[in-house]
Amino acid sequence: MAIITDVRVRQPLKDDLVGRRFTVTGIGSGFEGTIGIRLLDRRGDVLAQTSAQSAGGMAAVGEFSTEVRVTSPPPAGTRVTLQVFGDNPGLPDEGPDPGFNLREVSVIMFPDLQGWLLYRVERGDTLTGIVRKTRPFGRTTVKQIVAANPRITDPDRIETGWRLRIPLRD
């Protein structure tokens, strides 16, 4: 019998915005149903670490869900890497590090994230103008809008029709 294991992340997805507390969900299997979860900064240092229990138990793939809490978050707009993996049942020097079926998801952290607005760029808009228009809904900056929208490669060039995420902070 050729039973294999797997881990898949359903949330968050690549380039999602996350706050200092966010939910990780997916499907997977690991030793005794344990799914390992780590959040790394750009240097690879661990910002948060936790685990979840797969509903599949020992060998079956099942759903999992848990909350990640970052006690010392990086500055707003920082790209971080979420690692999700099946727990390694071996000794520290055995098996893959950090675990089996490693999945990595690059997300953008805004520690005080309250949510975000979806804004459709109109003819004549600038990022500074968008900051002014959205001010009644919450605080944001041009730099944060650029960080929240990977498609913006030059802050002076946005296109009519683009949908932008406008991060709102507490």
Predicted regions and their residues:
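Soluble periplasmic/extracytoplasmic beta-strand elements of cell-envelope proteins
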Residues: 38, 81-83, 120-122, 144, ...
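Short solvent-exposed coil/turn linkers within tandem alpha-helical repeat scaffolds
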Residues: 136, 151-153
